[in-house]
Amino acid sequence: MDVAQVRNAILRVARALEAHKDRLTELDQAMGDGDLGITAGKMAAALSAYAADEPSVADVGTYVAQAGMAVNRAASSSLGTLLATAAMRAGKEVRGQDGVDAADLARMLTAADVGIQERGKTGPGNKTIIDVVHPAAEAFAGAVAEGADVAVAAGRMLEAARAGRDAVTPLRSRVGRASWVGERTEGLVDPGCEAGVVILEAIASSTEDT
């Protein structure tokens, strides 16, 4: 996967966030302050603008990290900050490389997962985006370790991401604004989890071209 293919992945993420922003708003209104759709729109616009032109660098790591910086400037909300951190950590993992293979992508996903957990100061099981990203990263890395190609690993990543979202849906939110409404969040899809699935679906779709 070279920088042109990474650019395609970023554009797919931007389109997916824009397409799902109303759904994310609805989910967030049920258990938060209802602004996640606005954040998704800002992230989509920032990523679209960033990837609108041909990449100015061949270095995949730098290109991904700079995309994270663009998100951070445009959407400094909780989710925006977490996703910006994820991209910057992922990019740092492969800085200096003009292409990435399945093993590199596994390292990038793991770095993104660790970055989100450190920045968010929480871990799996608290009904946050981590409950999507963490199992997704583990599933991708596990598949690659078994010799799977990128497309197969991406499929397993998506299965784990969706299962992670669904597993915590019955739970009560314990982190962030959603925790303020307590038991009302039980049985509701966490908007951060849904956003994580949307993003990973877009990334996975781009691997079909590799």
Predicted regions and their residues:
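N-terminal loops that bind phosphate or other acidic moieties
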Residues: 1-210
